[in-house]
Amino acid sequence: MATQFRGVIPPVVTPLTADGEVDKVSFARSLNRMIDAGVDGLFTLGSSGEVAFSTDARRREIIQTVMEIVDGRVPVFVGCIDTETNRVIEHAKEAKELGASAIVATCPFYALGGLPEIERHFRLIHEAVPELPLFAYDIPVCVHTKLPGGLLVKLGQEGVLAGVKDSSNDDVAFRFLVDDNAKAGHPLTLLTGQEVVVDGAYMAGADGSVPGLANVEATGY
């Protein structure tokens, strides 16, 4: 288990100016407020962070800005989310270059494959950047595939995955994942994307949470 990654890790909102540029002043204010509130890490370029709407150059600018503001005070997770494996690997290598603490990737989407393709996808990402802990982002509402718990635990046991960011809203499946992970020796750090019933996720066995509302008020988490 990636024990260094636990607790509250908000999915950072990327503030933009009226002209669509990164608002670095507001960004610094937001990140510093969350760090001062005691968060355990930050997740940039997730669903809340404009990742699906950012060019490669914009992604790089966002990562650089976050790394400069955070300045090593907390771990920074970087979303490397794209339609297919080679593009994800390009983002992952750039995240490594810019100082990411961990990377987060969904399964491939748009051109949908089966479980063998999904497994190979995560293996290839890990092989490309083995130094960076890799978290699987389970968000079926966006990628139209639910990641099976058995596959996730298997990849955790083999050292491919360090953890899971669960945004499936499937509380039953999450409970089974927690149980299977525990039986396997807890190879995965399990982070819930729940924010309203995050207490229930913790009681079920989550190692941490990724609550979007923490961008507004982090102390409650």
Regions found by a protein language model. Name each.
Residues 124, 128, 140-221:
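Catalytic alpha/beta core domains of metabolic enzymes, predominantly
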Residues 2-146:
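Active-site beta->alpha loop and helix N-cap motifs at the rims of alpha/beta catalytic domains
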